[in-house]
Amino acid sequence: PTGGGGGKKKPPPPPLAAIQAAQEGYPVFSVSSDVQGSTGIASFQKSFPDRFVEVGIAESNMVSVGAGYAKIGFIPIVDTFGQFGVTKGNLPLTMAALSQAPVIAIFSHVGFQDAADGASHQATTYFAAISSIPHTVVIAPSCSGEAHALMHAAIKRYAEDRQAGRDGESYVFFVGRENYPIHWIDGATYPWGRSQVIREGADVVLVGCGPLLSKAVQAGELLAEKGVSATVISNPFVNRVDLETITPWVEKAQGRVVTIEDHQVVCGMGAQLSHALSDQGTRHQVTTLGIGGGFGQSAYMAEHLYERHGLTAKDMADAAQKLLD
């Protein structure tokens, strides 16, 4: 497999999947808090003007209203920037799960993807904040095809749970701001709950998710130039680790793993992956690249902050090389 995906780039399209699902008859309903143009859900609202409500700059109320729509038979989709979704929305998300009123969330501009707005707007604890809420699935897609497929699958699963009389789960999608490739592998499919092997190797496993999967792909290419064979894995289901896919590659690499994420190292994707591997008894040594306990800064582009915080492809390749030395 090759990284890069080829072709024109476009933003990840969960809203396009919502439009598709509504056209197919699913009772999707949008609840927004002022930034629907930035999150992309405005396209759904334009297509279905009788299927949305705008609550203003009131993210906590947005999630609570969404839970209310769940109780009367809709499939609610709430949207805002990641920072406000995981802070102001945390208690309502917990109450929605407790009340058997799950919601689907699109929380965008995560991590350093919101470079220009500075530290106050940069969500760096989003995995940690949401992953431990019961009955809540955290998803960090890394390409447009994956985002579309998994959002459509989430809506379908929501409807199936309701029809079967099950309580169901909330699905929280964390997406970036800057462009994603359409696919990392041409013709790829995205089965629910599964990771995707982007590149196969034997010496070390590189795991990424969301916007920083690109760094893992590039790191794999840098290592190949040095004769190091790296497996690159996309891990979108952050708190539902796909051990069936990941474990054999970790064992093949004699336990050498490097993870990268646009998130604090503490309680992030890498920490949850390592915990899951340890819990099943898989011996491994992991180096986690992430934000080291500080806040972000204002910058023109996310790339400037990735360089400042050691989250580049070269940083990941160097970390992998250290595990091999």
Language-model segments: residues:
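Thiamine diphosphate
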Residues: 1-174, 179, 189, 313, ...
